[in-house]
Amino acid sequence: METEERHGAPVRALYDSNAACGGRKEVVMIKRWENLTRDEIAALDKDKTIVMLPTSATEQHGPHLPVGTDAIILSTLIDRIIAQGDEAFPKGNLIFAPQLPIGKSNEHMEFAGTITFSAQTYYALLHDIAKSIAASGFKKLVLFNSHGGNTDMLNLISRDLRIDLGLDVFVIDWWFTDFWADGLKGIQQSGKYGVFHACELETSLMLEARPETVHMELAVDEDPAEAFRGDKYVTVFGPVNAGWKTADVTKSGVIGAPTFATVEKGQKLFDYACEKLLDIFAEIADISY
């Protein structure tokens, strides 16, 4: 594929030598939306492009992690996928829309530092962004989520976006699913609630992504099982859900066991997540309604 120099940096040429006659070269890329020009976006083959809308949160993560943890982890993961190069996804284009670093986090509002949208505002925001993405001609949208408080809203709106905008919509959520299960095999040392919030998983990822923001000397482990009494049916995982807020189940703001976290685990988990996500994207690329 041809490149050109723009301000000293190589940039993919959108048009071949016959561009003046209307000929275009196909563009294949893994990129962030905000780094593309309008013409680069317009030139993408919409039948071979998946747009990812990353959703995260700004909320308390215990005494040892920054409030931007969910957003930092998600952004780092996106950077690592992009760093693998365009050839890492031969099935077409992966375009990461600008991340939404605020979500629905009202469960954490009793702790300082949390910023949240109401359910109504968050729904409207997601719908407007998806409408804008569809207006650029894209047909396939993935809601790519790193915050458990967003999960119900994303699952709800995915069908509405299909009905209202005609988009093929998918939700990749690494909470309340088995997304991390294989990656944690052989390295997880914490128990049932060891991986949940400001936990072994998130703390390990942050030790790898942004170690200067992690205060391991302040990390505490907290198991919410006592708050659920019987812990058989009514748990934070279900099968019977409760409308709990974070302060109902933890004093520290931690749900899990961050003291088991290590940077080595974080490295392995990022590698695992990159590989798994590319596999998921490959399957999504083959699906259309």
Where are these regions (language model features)?
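Generic low-complexity, intrinsically disordered sequence content enriched
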Residues: 5, 15-18, 48
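Selective for proline/serine-rich intrinsically disordered segments
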Residues: 7-8, 52
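Short, Lys/Arg-enriched N-terminal segments with co-localized hydrophobic residues
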Residues: 15-28
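Extended, histidine- and acidic-residue-enriched regions that form the cofactor-binding/catalytic faces
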Residues: 25-140, 148-289
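Conserved SAM-binding loop
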Residues: 143
